[in-house]
A protein has these predicted regions:
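Copper-binding active sites and cupredoxin-like electron-transfer domains
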Residues: 1-186
Length: 186
């Protein structure tokens, strides 16, 4: 059943069009047969940039959507009826080592946007640098409300934008700080 229109019949398509009224980072997912469709990958992220290109300007802007799947060993098809017992954690539907590195230059101002459409929270941790949370589901955070962090918790259905200056050269880990998630690709 549809929320604002009739459901889309199997095998048919529908183009969603809307006016992006405010800048920010947003997630989407279905509201019909939600768990099955999300288990098959029907979810995503989009960024609406501000009209003023100088507002909240950064040199590098990365976006990650956290997903979780239940897939039997040797299989490629997720179990679509799993509600909480997931065994594969992904970033933009990719598992380590298939995740591209976040490449930046020394001195770059870097933003990383993380959206969580899994069924658990993820304490996202950055090695080698401190960051501030500059954005949430509600929009940009006021500069006076920010403080240095190395880990931020991204709860179910939430989005966080973090920013830092790349001051220390090298390869630095960026991961979920739940040990059993890092053992399985996150």
């Amino acid at each position: 059943s549809g929320l604002t229109q009739p459901p889309i019949p199997p095998g048919k398509t529908f183009v969603y069009e809307f006016v992006a009224r405010r800048p920010g980072t947003f997630m989407y997912h279905p509201h019909a047969d939600e768990m099955v469709q999300m288990a098959m990958g029907m979810m995503g992220f989009w960024v609406t940039h501000p009209k003023d290109a100088g507002f909240m300007r950064v040199d590098r802007d990365f976006v990650f959507l956290l997903n979780a799947y239940d897939i039997d060993p040797g299989s490629f098809t997720p179990k679509v009826n799993t509600m909480l017992d997931f065994n594969l954690w992904t970033w933009n539907s990719r598992a380590f080592p298939g995740i591209d590195p976040l490449v930046c230059r020394l001195g770059d101002k870097v933003r990383i946007r993380i959206g969580n459409l899994t069924m658990t929270n993820h304490p996202i941790h950055l090695h080698g640098h401190e960051f501030v949370v500059t954005g949430t589901d509600g929009g940009w955070t006021a500069p006076g409300s920010r403080w240095p962090e190395v880990t931020t918790d991204v709860a179910v259905g939430q989005m966080r934008a973090i920013e830092f200056e790349a001051t220390d050269p090298g390869d630095w880990a960026f991961h979920c700080h739940k040990a059993h998630h890092t053992m399985n690709a996150m």
